[in-house]
């Protein structure tokens, strides 16, 4: 289906990132260094399964092909499997993925797959157990690794692993990561550290451009792959000697926003046109009843006309994003 979601700059939107909670049990230094602190929203305040069903139905009708469930940590919701199944009801949505810290993968991943999940991203910022503990605040490295193995055993042909690239923390560990994916079908995605409202000091201390890694990969014979229309923002590289792939997400690179194809809905039902945009468009009053779908689609389409051509990270403008758990990264 051709996307009906097209902005003023002729960008088409096939990809919805849907946050279902902002609660997380990890304390990652770049996201929630002081742990989760409720912002006045209780668990009962997050989108219900029926509301999720309605919002994804509207996006599917407008041409969305891929939905990624994010948080916080999505698997903390007891109804997470039901949420996957609700999204799966839309035939137009070909891919349903989750971004997770992985701590419940080993126990639940087979059930998620049975419910309709087609893709998994796991956050792993270090392959050293002690450093993993230091970054996340949780001594769960072996549990997360077992979860990745369980995902393959459950039938997932590929697992994506997200690694936030940080100077003097993990930027020098490329060889360790490459050895890990040599015989595993893992797409390892290095994500440039992004400045948020609460993370300016960390950003100044640890930001390093992904271009350093890209130059090194090209020097070693890695080959840049073409993007598909519902892919995320990663530049993906492959190598004939490796079962895995490398992805680079570099939001500070020139023209990063030119290929934007994704919209975001927060866990309380606000449409965000950009991860680092201002404010959000409330959709929740149109998620109460199935009869509101036409009005919901109209509001989404109208909001998209206001999407700006680019973010303003280069000007140190992080918008309303105080931390990445709020809107799901």
Swiss-Prot record:
One of its GO terms (biological process) is Mo-molybdopterin cofactor biosynthetic process. It catalyses: GTP + AH2 + S-adenosyl-L-methionine = (8S)-3',8-cyclo-7,8-dihydroguanosine 5'-triphosphate + 5'-deoxyadenosine + L-methionine + A + H(+). GTP binds at residues 17, 68, 99, 160, 262-264. GO terms for molecular function: 4 iron, 4 sulfur cluster binding; cyclic pyranopterin monophosphate synthase activity; GTP 3',8'-cyclase activity; GTP binding; metal ion binding; S-adenosyl-L-methionine binding. Its EC number is 4.1.99.22. Binds 2 [4Fe-4S] clusters. Binds 1 [4Fe-4S] cluster coordinated with 3 cysteines and an exchangeable S-adenosyl-L-methionine and 1 [4Fe-4S] cluster coordinated with 3 cysteines and the GTP-derived substrate. The keyword S-adenosyl-L-methionine applies. InterPro entries: Aldolase_TIM, Elp3/MiaA/NifB-like_rSAM, MoaA, MoaA_NifB_PqqE_Fe-S-bd_CS, MoaA_twitch, MoCo_biosynth_MoaA/MoaC, rSAM. Residues 8-234 form the Radical SAM core domain. Belongs to the radical SAM superfamily. MoaA family. NCBIfam families: moaA (TIGR02666). Catalyzes the cyclization of GTP to (8S)-3',8-cyclo-7,8-dihydroguanosine 5'-triphosphate. This is GTP 3',8-cyclase. The lineage of its organism: Bacteria, Pseudomonadati, Pseudomonadota, Gammaproteobacteria, Enterobacterales.
């Amino acid at each position: 289906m051709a996307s009906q979601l097209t902005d003023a700059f002729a960008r088409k939107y096939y990809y919805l990132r849907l946050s279902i909670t902002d609660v997380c049990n990890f304390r990652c230094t770049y996201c929630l260094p002081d742990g989760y602190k409720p912002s006045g929203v209780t668990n009962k305040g997050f989108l219900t399964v029926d509301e999720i069903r309605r919002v994804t139905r509207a996006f599917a009708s407008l041409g969305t092909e891929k939905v990624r469930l994010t948080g916080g940590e999505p698997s903390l919701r007891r109804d997470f499997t039901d949420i996957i199944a609700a999204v799966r009801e839309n035939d137009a949505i070909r891919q349903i993925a989750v971004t997770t810290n992985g701590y419940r993968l080993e126990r639940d991943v087979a059930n998620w797959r049975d419910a309709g999940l087609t893709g998994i991203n796991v956050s792993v910022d270090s392959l050293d157990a002690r450093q993993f503990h230091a970054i996340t605040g949780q001594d769960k490295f072996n549990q997360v690794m077992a979860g990745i193995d369980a995902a393959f055993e459950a039938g997932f042909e590929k697992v994506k692993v997200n690694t936030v690239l940080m100077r003097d923390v993990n930027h020098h560990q490329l060889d360790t990561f490459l050895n890990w994916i040599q015989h595993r079908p893992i797409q390892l995605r290095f994500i440039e550290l992004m400045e948020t409202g609460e993370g300016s000091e960390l950003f100044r201390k640890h930001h390093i451009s992904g271009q350093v890694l890209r130059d090194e990969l090209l020097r070693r014979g890695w080959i840049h792959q073409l993007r598909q229309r519902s892919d995320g923002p990663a530049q993906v590289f492959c190598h004939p000697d490796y079962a895995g792939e490398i992805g680079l997400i570099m939001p500070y690179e020139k023209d990063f926003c030119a290929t934007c194809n994704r919209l975001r809905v927060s866990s309380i039902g606000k449409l965000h046109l950009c991860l680092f945009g201002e404010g959000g468009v409330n959709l929740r009053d149109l998620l109460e009843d199935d009869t509101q779908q036409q009005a919901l689609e109209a509001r989404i389409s109208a909001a998209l006309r206001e999407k700006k051509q680019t973010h303003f990270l280069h000007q140190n403008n992080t918008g309303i994003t105080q931390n990445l758990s709020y809107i799901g990264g």
